[in-house]
Curated annotation (Swiss-Prot):
It comes from the Eukaryota. The gene is ergic2. Coiled coil: none annotated. Residues 1-33, 340-376 are cytoplasmic. One of its GO terms (cellular component) is membrane. This is Endoplasmic reticulum-Golgi intermediate compartment protein 2. Keywords: Endoplasmic reticulum, ER-Golgi transport, Golgi apparatus, Membrane, Transmembrane, Transmembrane helix, Transport. Belongs to the ERGIC family. It is found in: Endoplasmic reticulum-Golgi intermediate compartment membrane; Golgi apparatus, cis-Golgi network membrane; Endoplasmic reticulum membrane. It is a multi-pass membrane protein.
Length: 376
């Protein structure tokens, strides 16, 4: 009894087969069908190969939200070379609340302003990359995905001993400031505290020594990430006057970067540059120096590196294989039909299958005509 029930169940399942098998004796192979099959398998292999590279690739997803962190400190990473002696210049930060930030984290190093041949080559390469970034903004995704892998963004050390005197000052290091708008500036004289803010001892420096030609090797905010280029990296300005004033208006955007290699809380920024000559007689007032006025955006950007799921990769592969099979089968039938029409195998009113012709002959030979029956 159990065997009968099992046999009935198998027969029932067999009747539900949506993929009936055709015996090989009923299958006819042709050269055209083999050619189409070969082309189909080649196309499937190529598309599957390219799809594998799409599966391996990643992309950056950008999300925006309100920055709720107001208590933490903002780190400023600085590496600037000014064409003046270190004893003549001073750098400090004054925020929106008129709070002077101590510049103890900055190092003043006497250097030669002109770069060595190897350093100049590095600087030209950096400027070339910056130019491409300004033209092709999508390249920033490439930098995000390749952090910690690119060449170092710091100026390489001088490979030769300078013969000329140390006529410049390299100011490098980092500062921690409040997350409010502020002004980082480099001007004549060392900074001293003042009840109403701060002041610089500029009276002790000769006016003829003023030269605020400078080169920004690196300027970033937040955690410093090797391999990431910032908008002002590689900027070089040459002062044409002793009373030159350089201004940089910076908008900082907090950024959380999460890739498969690094997770960091950093900051991106955009900058607008302006420079002018201080001439009180002509109404152009101000102080000679380098001024970087920054403001912090209230929005935060989350940059996340994403990858195609494996199940989606399998679904796309199945779609490629099934789509090519169906398409090539339809095209093969369509081409075969067109060839038959061109070869005049199907002529309206003329072509008849052989079996039908034989059947008509048998009818004509065995069945008498009506006229013959009438005569008889």
């Amino acid at each position: 009894m159990r065997r009968l029930n099992k046999k009935k169940a198998l027969n029932f399942v067999r009747e539900l087969d949506a993929f009936p098998k055709v015996p090989e004796s009923y299958v006819e192979t042709t050269a055209s069908g083999g050619t189409v099959s070969l082309l189909a398998f080649t196309a499937m292999a190529l598309l599957a190969f390219f799809e594998f590279f799409v599966y391996r690739d990643t992309w950056m997803k950008y999300e925006y939200e309100v920055d709720k962190d107001f208590t933490s400190k903002l780190r400023i990473n600085i590496d600037i070379t000014v064409a003046m002696r270190c004893q003549f210049v001073g750098a400090d930060v004054l925020d929106l609340a008129e709070t002077m930030v101590a510049s103890d984290g900055l190092v003043y190093e006497p250097v030669v302003f002109d770069l060595s041949p190897q350093q100049r080559l590095w600087h030209r390469t950096l400027l070339l990359i910056q130019g491409r970034l300004r033209e092709e903004h999508s390249l920033q995704d490439v930098l995000f995905k390749n952090v910690m892998k690119g060449s170092p963004t710091a100026l390489p050390p001088r490979e030769d001993d300078p013969n000329q005197p140390l006529n410049a000052c390299r100011i490098h290091g980092h500062l921690y400031v409040n997350k409010v708008a502020g002004n980082f500036h480099i001007t004549v004289g060392k900074a001293i505290p003042h009840p109403r803010g701060h002041a610089h001892l500029a009276a002790l420096v000769s006016h003829e020594t003023y030269n605020f030609s400078h080169r920004i090797d690196h300027l970033s905010f937040g955690e410093e990430i090797p391999g990431i280029l910032n908008p002002l990296d590689g900027t070089e300005k040459v002062s044409a006057d002793h009373n030159q004033m350089f201004q940089y208006f910076i908008t900082i955007v907090p950024t959380k970067l999460q890739t498969y290699k690094v997770y960091a809380d950093t900051h991106q920024y955009s900058v607008t540059e302006r420079e002018r000559v201080i001439n009180h007689a002509a109404g152009s007032h101000g102080v000679s120096g380098i001024f970087m006025k920054y403001d912090i955006s209230s929005l935060m950007v989350k940059v996340t590196e994403q990858h195609m799921p494996f199940w989606q990769f399998l679904v796309r592969l199945c779609g490629i294989i099934g789509g090519i099979f169906s398409t090539t089968g339809m095209l093969h039938n369509l081409v075969g039909f067109c060839v038959d029409v061109v070869c005049c195998r199907f002529k309206l009113g003329v072509y008849k299958p052989k079996s039908m012709s034989d059947f008509d002959g048998q009818i004509n030979s065995l069945t008498p005509l009506l006229s013959e029956n009438a005569e008889q």
